[in-house]
Structures are given as C-alpha cells and as structure tokens.
Design a protein with these regions (language model features):
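Short, conserved beta-strand segments of beta-strand-rich sandwich/propeller modules, principally
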Residues: 85-89, 145, 208-212, 254, ...
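Aromatic/hydrophobic beta-strand junction motif of beta-rich domains
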Residues: 4-12, 146-152, 253-261, 298
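Beta-strand-rich binding/interaction modules
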Residues: 3-37, 162, 265-272
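Long, low-complexity serine/threonine/glycine- and acidic-rich segments characteristic of extracellular
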Residues: 23-111, 126-133, 147-233, 286-291
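Short, surface-exposed loop/turn motifs with a glycine/proline- and acidic-biased composition
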Residues: 201, 205-208, 285-324
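C-terminal tail/sorting-segment detector
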Residues: 227-228, 232, 245, 255, ...
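Glycine-centered coil/turn sites that cap beta-strands in beta-rich domains
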Residues: 232-274, 284-285, 295-298, 319-324
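Short, compositionally biased P/S/T/A/G/V-rich stretches that sit at domain boundaries
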Residues: 1-5, 9-11, 111-144, 151, ...
Length: 338
C-alpha cells in the first residue's frame, strides 16, 4: 500500500467553497462475458468482450476552500499493476448548494505500491443491524439493514482486485447468502483510515441467524466479526425521536422521523390536533427509508383547505414497517403567522 495525495482546483471560480465527491478507479480491464445465448448455433458462439473500470481504489469526500482542494487516499496492494491509466471522477457542490462542478482526470498510472512488513494487524470492525444501539442477540425485522464501520491506520482495501479480498458478508454460512459490499463502501469525510459499508438484507425466515463480516486493510491483513440475531415477523420499529425543522413554523415545516428501519419499506402517518383534542390534519405515506430519518413536508394546510393559524398544536407520528403494528410519539408544534 502507498499513500497518495491529489490536489486540484475549480476552474474559473476562485471563490468556490463546498464539498468534492471523489472516485478513483483502477486501469481498464478486458471483461469477457459468458457464452450463454442458447439461440446462437454452437459453432458460431463467441464470447462478447469489452473494457471496463470495475475496480474502485477510493471513494470519499473532502472540502473545497477558495476553489482549491486536496485529498489523500491509500493505494492497496491489490491493484492491476498495469501501465494503463487510471481515472479520477469528481463532482463538487457549493456550500449554498446553488453551484455544481464536474471533472475527471486520467493522466496517472497506479502500477506500484510500498510494502510495509511491520503491519500484520487487520482493520477494526464495528457492525450492527438497523441501529447502533443493536446488541448481539437482539431481535430484528425480517429485512434488517446491516452497517459496518471499519478503521485501519494504513487504509482499507475495498478495491476488489484480489481474489478473496472483498468486503464480504455471509449469512448463516450459506454461499447463497454471501454478499460483496465493496461498491457500498465509502470513506469518512476527509479520511482514508475510516469508513463504512452497508447492505439491506433480503427477507430472512423467522428464528435465529448468524452473520459473519470480513474486511481487509491495504496490506491484505484480514479481520472478521460475527453477530447473532433473531428475526421476528411483525416486529414494531423503534421510533427514536420526532422533530420539526421549523418550530415555531411560519408557512411550512418538515417532520423528521428517526427510526431503526434503514433500507426498509415504512408506513408513516402524521396527525395534527389543537390543544382541545380536535383533529385538524392527517397524512400517511409509504416509502423506502434510505437512512435512519424519514422526512415529510407540510405547508400547514388543513384537511378542510384552511391554513393553520397562530397557536400551539400537538402532532403525533406513527410508523410501521413490513406489515408490523405502528409505534407512535407525540410533540408540540408552535405556529407563528407573520
């Protein structure tokens, strides 16, 4: 593994401040498809080939200040060692989210790495299902969301170039339930020593299960961790907190629902009452929660078409998932009309 630092700038905008999303890919490789076209005569069959950059060396984010940026990443031992050029893709967004920029560079090769014989320790791994509050042996829903936090002082190997050196998740020791999590891995902001990967598990049968997760550092030192868990059909979600972006609200607000069903289909229902208990507004929707927070926008218009006036109100949020019963919390909403 080697440590590389890349510097650059936003062309024509010296005052640009924001965030750069960076992906560094290895050299192109020839990919040969399987000859599985049953309609093609046996003698005429020929494998389709194409070139692709299928191996990612680094994916992360870093800051841009006054149009200038720099990012550092670890080059794993598992690179192609080709004289062909690699590729850097960048996407930038300004702090005020009004301006974006894109760029790429292929004027470099990744065909060597330093060897550190002193590093024989694999990365540290912390993993959980659905929520960081998960404890080994806990109950989960049939489609739990797996997250692994990985740290290593020399960097993490998520390139997928070496045979067997993938970020790998195995359920119940079953090869049919073995998943490659390289593409889901991303380094923490401004870091090449810590990051995370994730996976939304397919529906599992009720009962006890075991998972094993394996990760490698850039010197190909492995680490593994295991979790046991019990799948319970119809298990209620954990509703950690509810809040509003504008409280007091003037013309609109956004309800924020924090829960433990990342990557799952959720059913969210919101009701608003006045302080005497009179029901004023209701809303329900289904959707996939990509993170641990589900948001619902509201323009303060009631069911009868009227506008919510200045006052103190009560809102109740209910959430369910995968056909489970609903969990609820309630809070106050203050409206101040201007």
């Amino acid at each position: 593994g080697s440590i590389a630092t890349i510097k650059g700038h936003i062309e024509g905008d010296e005052g640009f401040n924001g965030i750069a999303n960076i992906t560094v890919r290895d050299a192109r490789e020839l990919v040969t498809c399987r000859m599985n076209d049953a309609n093609e005569p046996e003698g005429a069959k020929s494998a389709f080939t194409f070139y692709d950059r299928s191996k990612t060396i680094y994916t992360g984010n870093d800051s841009i200040r006054a149009g200038q940026f720099a990012f550092t990443f670890a080059v794993p031992k598992d690179i192609s060692y080709s004289d062909a050029t690699g590729l850097i893709n960048l996407h930038a967004i300004s702090t005020d989210r009004k301006t974006s920029a894109n760029g790429w560079c292929d004027r470099f090769v990744a065909n060597g790495s330093d060897i550190n014989d002193n590093d024989s320790i694999g990365p540290s791994i912390y993993c959980y299902l659905n929520s960081p509050s998960f404890s080994n042996g806990d109950r989960v829903n049939p489609t739990p969301y797996f997250v692994a936090r990985i740290t290593d002082q020399n960097g993490i190997n998520a390139a997928g170039s070496g045979i067997g050196h993938d970020l790998q998740l195995i359920i119940d020791g079953d090869m049919q339930h073995t998943y490659n999590l390289n593409e889901n891995f991303s380094y923490d902001f401004g870091s090449y020593t810590s990051g995370s990967t994730f996976y939304a598990l397919p529906e599992l049968a009720p009962g006890q299960h075991r998972l094993l997760f394996r990760a490698w550092d850039v010197y190909n030192n492995p680490s593994t961790t295991e979790l046991t868990f019990t799948v319970v059909k119809g298990l209620k979600p954990n509703l950690f907190s509810i809040s509003c972006t504008n409280n007091p609200a003037h013309t609109s607000t956004t309800f924020i629902v924090n829960h433990d069903r990342m990557g799952s289909n959720v059913n969210v229902a919101i009701d608003v009452f006045d302080m005497s208990g009179r029901h004023l507004w209701t809303h329900s929707e289904n959707g996939v929660s990509e993170g641990s927070a589900y948001t619902v926008n509201w323009n303060l218009t009631l069911d009868n078409g009227a506008t919510l006036q200045t006052g103190v109100y009560l809102y109740r949020v209910r959430i369910g998932s995968d056909g489970s019963a609903m969990t609820s919390k309630a809070k106050k909403l203050v409206v101040v009309r201007q």
